[in-house]
């Protein structure tokens, strides 16, 4: 029996792999799913600093020949960097609203968003719960009602020590020349995220998809997202 295509799912900020990719469980019927928890997220301990470059190096341990890499949000930035480091190990690359806002500087919506995020980090509250509420409102994610769980509060503390993804230098030349299909997905809710995704589409020669209805966390749509990824990965397998 042939082995199943291998999907490596890289989560973003605030919540771990299990919560980020819960709606992708049905994909396990078609694919081998690898979804590691990044450092600083439950059930692991807190960390003092999160840096996307260091995370890209850490992610390499999970790359194997033929991997289909899928990254959401901060995990999308990590995935872009990891793909440029080891393109020979990848069969395809999918990123979902990576906050690499530096690539869209000069676009008013992106510039305004960068300013608001930087203000939140430098001048905002240091209370993890309130910091998280403000962050979720900024990026277009649903804010849970009531008190935050200990797991979410840990995610908030990790969020507070993240290096700004707007500082990421995306290696466009390496990625564009890599002979693998690329897909950029957005949720159609934010002009700032759309600006980033539009630049990535153009500079990487990527396919582009917009799936509205779940804000920043497009994968939480479940079936529509899963069908998109399934079609893209199966096409990549035969290309």
Residue ranges and their predicted role:
Residues 211-226:
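Catalytic histidine-centered segment of alpha/beta-hydrolase-like enzymes
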């Amino acid at each position: 029996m042939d082995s199943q295509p291998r999907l490596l799912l890289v989560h973003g900020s605030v919540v771990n792999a299990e919560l980020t990719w819960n709606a992708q469980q049905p994909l396990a019927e078609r694919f081998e799913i690898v979804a590691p928890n990044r450092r600083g997220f439950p059930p692991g301990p807190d960390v003092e600093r999160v840096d996307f470059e260091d995370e890209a190096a850490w992610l390499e341990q999970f790359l194997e020949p033929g991997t289909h890499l899928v990254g959401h949000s901060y995990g999308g930035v990590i995935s872009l960097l990891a793909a440029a480091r080891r393109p020979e190990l990848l069969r395809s690359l999918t990123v979902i609203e990576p906050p690499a806002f530096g690539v869209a500087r000069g676009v008013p919506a992106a510039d305004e968003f960068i300013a608001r995020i930087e203000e939140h980090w430098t001048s905002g509250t240091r209370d993890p719960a309130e910091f998280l509420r403000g962050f979720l409102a900024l990026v277009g994610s649903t804010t849970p009602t009531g008190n935050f769980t200990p797991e979410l509060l840990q995610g908030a503390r990790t969020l507070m020590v993240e290096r700004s993804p707007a500082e990421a230098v995306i290696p466009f030349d390496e990625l564009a020349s890599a002979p693998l299909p690329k897909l950029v997905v957005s949720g159609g809710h934010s002009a700032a995220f759309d600006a980033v995704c539009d630049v990535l589409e153009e500079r990487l020669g990527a396919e582009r998809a917009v799936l509205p209805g779940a804000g920043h966390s497009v994968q939480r749509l479940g079936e529509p997202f899963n069908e998109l990824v399934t079609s893209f990965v199966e096409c990549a397998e035969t290309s």
